[in-house]
Regions:
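Ser/Thr-rich, Pro/Gly/Ala-heavy low-complexity intrinsically disordered linkers and tails
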Residues: 1-58
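Aromatic (Trp/Tyr/Phe) and Gly/Pro-enriched flexible surface segments
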Residues: 50-334
Length: 334
């Protein structure tokens, strides 16, 4: 598994499926620490400290990671549980999928090997810009290449709030830029390649209060696209992004090894899972491409209530679909 990127902190056509799930739990831990690392005078002149873990001169505080036991077994479609959140006895979570019914599912495996087995528990979440049920079908003109009907307007130039497409600048050195745009400065360049036209937008949106004794989260993801390799380098630039809306960071936290947003044009295909790779035989991706599991890591303030939006969408048109697998959300410390 690769670790990629670091950030801070319905049924029937045309209907949306609201899979909102809320679980209330005891989030107490054995100790409490203040992990704030930002000093300086806040005037934006660059004298603010970098977050713990990014500044070698800053000692990170003690850490207590809440215990976790997977709760994704069975047949239900609890989106939070599928990625490792909201389990009994754990942290309060409010989560909901906004997607067409055919555009998301729970999955126990993909392909002919164990490459895409769960990285936590027994199942993981799939979001797709096409029918997720097509994933196990052989490729043809229609499998993994269908319009779903959009949650957003087809060809919409704006992604739903709080996502912002424009670059914010350096939010580390100038914290007053938080909230003005994408602190990762990775979304705008990719969307400009599709003239900001998005189709088949699907998302999982999570609101959660960060435990007082942690200051980061991570999760695993894999990206697959029928547009690989034929559309690589073109304007048909499907994307997967994860927007973090926190007190000290507003922006994308799902990045490639090179620090780019995850898109058809930045991923291309990985050598082990290029078209005709054995792991993809018998799937709609057998002539296309995929990534292995990757890990995204993001920093955020302890005790802050944050919103995290996992989103995937087609670029420029709604055919040649893309999918993202998401699993193993966990808390941690820098």
């Amino acid at each position: 598994m690769e670790e990629a990127g670091t950030g801070t902190a319905g049924s029937g056509e045309g209907e949306n499926t609201d899979a909102s799930t809320t679980s209330s739990t005891d989030a107490s831990t054995t100790s409490s620490t203040d992990a704030s690392t930002t000093s300086g005078d806040g005037d934006g002149d660059g004298d603010e400290d970098l977050p713990c873990g990014l500044d070698p001169d800053v000692d990170c505080p003690a850490c207590v990671v809440p215990q976790h036991a997977p709760c994704d077994e069975g047949e239900g479609l609890d989106a939070a549980a599928l990625i490792g959140l909201g389990c009994p006895g754990e942290i309060q979570v409010s989560a909901g999928v906004t997607a067409m019914e055919e555009g998301w599912e729970a999955r126990t495996h993909f392909g002919t090997t164990d490459t895409w087995d769960p990285t936590e528990g027994e199942r993981y979440l799939v979001l797709g810009t096409g029918h997720t049920s097509d994933l196990d079908l052989p490729p043809d003109m229609t499998t993994c290449s269908q319009f779903l009907g959009d949650v957003e307007e087809p060809g919409d130039l704006d992604l739903p709030a709080p996502i912002q497409e424009t670059n914010a600048g350096d939010c580390y050195l100038y914290p007053e830029l938080v909230g003005t745009g994408d602190c990762s400065n990775t979304i705008q360049g990719q969307l400009s390649q599709i003239s900001f036209n998005t189709y088949d937008y699907m998302e999982l949106r999570v609101q959660v209060t960060v435990p007082e004794t942690v200051d980061q989260f991570s999760f695993d993801w894999a990206f697959l696209s029928r547009g690989i390799p034929g559309d690589v380098g073109s304007g048909y630039n499907d994307m997967f992004l994860v927007w973090l809306e926190a007190g000290d960071w507003t922006g994308n936290v799902a990045l490639t090894d090179q620090g780019n947003a995850v898109s058809l044009n930045t991923i291309g295909f990985e050598p082990d899972y290029e078209p005709s790779a054995p792991a993809l035989v018998g799937t709609c991706m057998a002539e296309s491409g995929a990534t292995d599991w990757n890990t995204a890591v993001a920093f955020l303030p302890p005790g802050d209530t944050v919103t995290i939006v996992f989103a995937v969408f087609d670029g420029f048109d709604g055919t040649l679909d893309s999918y993202v697998f998401i699993d193993n959300f966990r808390w941690g410390c820098q």
